[in-house]
């Protein structure tokens, strides 16, 4: 059985403006960790490394692009991201976003509320 895992993609259009897109990763039932019972999992996605990131409570940053293509997985707290087109999305604990807006005006990021945010960024190759 194929089960989709939802995530948000932040991408750049031909005019250089960033936008959000709702996407899914296919999870399939597989023997992921034998001899346990099967689990739902994606195929392995090659990664170049990861970093744990802490945003202080009430942190806010200027317009910036992601320095490289990366997955961002929210471990705790909430952030609001504003794309170049003005659309905002709030990411909460457990949410995932794929940042792919290099070389542009990028996006705004701010911590929502007065609690710190912990996230894990996973860098991926420039071309998948």
Question: What does each model-found stretch correspond to?
Answer:
Residues 71-75, 98-100, 119-121:
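Active-site scaffold segments
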Residues 61-63, 81-82, 90, 99, ...:
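Short beta-strand His + acidic residue motifs that chelate non-heme Fe in jelly-roll/DSBH
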Residues 25, 54, 84-101:
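Short acidic-glycine-tyrosine-enriched beta hairpin
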Residues 46-51, 70, 75-77, 105:
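A generic structural signal for short beta-strands and their flanking turns/coil linkers
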Residues 14-63, 117-128:
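A short glycine-rich, His/Asp/Glu-containing loop-to-beta-strand
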Residues 65, 71-92:
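A short beta-strand-loop-beta hairpin characteristic of the jelly-roll/cupin
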Residues 1-12:
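Short acidic, Pro/Gly- and aromatic-enriched capping/linker segments at domain boundaries
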């Amino acid at each position: 059985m194929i089960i989709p895992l939802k995530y948000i993609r932040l991408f750049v259009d031909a005019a250089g403006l960033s936008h959000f897109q709702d996407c899914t990763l296919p999870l399939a039932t597989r023997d992921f960790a034998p001899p346990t019972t099967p689990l739902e999992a994606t195929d392995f996605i090659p990664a170049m490394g990861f970093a744990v990131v802490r945003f202080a409570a009430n942190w806010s940053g200027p317009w910036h692009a992601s320095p490289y293509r990366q997955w961002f997985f929210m471990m705790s707290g909430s952030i609001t991201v504003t794309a170049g087109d003005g659309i905002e999305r709030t990411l909460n604990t457990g949410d995932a976003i794929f940042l792919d807006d290099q070389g542009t005006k990028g996006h705004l990021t701010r911590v929502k509320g007065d609690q710190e945010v912990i996230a894990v960024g996973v860098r991926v190759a420039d071309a998948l």
